[in-house]
């Protein structure tokens, strides 16, 4: 089967990951001890995408949990599904990375990385036909960003032909958790551009907005935010895990969404988002799902798709619905808002339909868009980076761990190149074919 090995790193990654395993276990009818209590055969038919069956038909997540300090892991272990993980798959150090990318990537993280890779190998070997890896991490801290990107590049070396999907929480525009976020994020993006296949970009502020505006939660907790993220994570792979009429997998997604190899940073969204109290009063239709799905307020990262154009997009529907209706709605969106789609990629929306909806809903949809507007986010981080780097603020923490200023300059220019690539394709039109083709060859 098409297995996916899940890796979570750092505090943010571990908290998102823990929530994700609650959601997936629930979907497959697995209780916190790993016993199957489901009422349907479909839940177990392809459960081995995310779970390994151990002795006594216990299901164990194919999850690897890593951190440079034991704190978050202890709280995962004492959480609702803490006992379901394989104890050997908790890999942690004692020192912590202290929000320092260099510690995660070069010093502390580098010492721990071999033990993580051993666990990765063990998990990969127990797979029948490994499809790829999914990594949860944040780009603002030290472990998730520094050690996370180190692990991604090591896995890339060892499994060059497997998909590498990341769920990356980027620093938010208004709320900052650490002062050195712009440094950590820029250094991480520098790595992700080269080594990841698909990056789902998330950020806390956009998630907070969804909780406030749409879900009407007055004081959203990180648990609420992580729940939104895990809905998307489960939606992306539901086609692998449940039978459907139009299937998608990580590789099909990549082929349909990535027109140019470096432009693999996606906005994601999930529908229906309704406040907890009003859920049962709404019957959903495909047009309603579609409308909410393309809504800018629904995007889980702080970039506005209306400020750019979609290169490609993918809609993953779940539930019993007619594929004809799905296709009509998708076509409808493209025809009505044609200026928001680049005209040199015709029919650039891929859709897939999976028959089994998530718990408690009749139908749902997950949206993944490759929009040039994501450059807003990179621009924002880059400006903050430049402001600090110009004065060499906080740089001694990084050079003290053996980093070179050169590396910062490289990361900065790589990020700026990425922004201008997005801009170039946003401005490109189908008529300029001649000069456009020539530009490409020079690069």
Swiss-Prot record:
Location in the cell reads:
Cytoplasm, Cytoskeleton
GO cellular component labels = cytoplasm; microtubule
What's one Pfam family the UniProt record gives for this protein? Tubulin_C
Residues binding GTP, per UniProt: 11, 69, 138, 142-144, 204, 226
- List compositional bias (Acidic residues) regions by residue number: 429-443
Q: Which SUPFAM superfamilies match?
A: Tubulin C-terminal domain-like, Tubulin nucleotide-binding domain-like
Major subcellular location class = cytoplasm
Q: Give GO terms for biological process.
A: microtubule-based process
Annotated region (Disordered) at: 421-443
Q: Which cofactor does it need?
A: Mg(2+)
Role noted for this protein: Tubulin is the major constituent of microtubules, a cylinder consisting of laterally associated linear protofilaments composed of alpha- and beta-tubulin heterodimers. Microtubules grow by the addition of GTP-tubulin dimers to the microtubule end, where a stabilizing cap forms. Below the cap, tubulin dimers are in GDP-bound state, owing to GTPase activity of alpha-tubulin.
What PANTHER family does the database record attribute to this sequence? Answer: TUBULIN
Q: What is this protein called?
A: Tubulin beta chain
| Organism per entry | Polytomella agilis
Lineage per the UniProt record: Eukaryota, Viridiplantae, Chlorophyta, core chlorophytes, Chlorophyceae
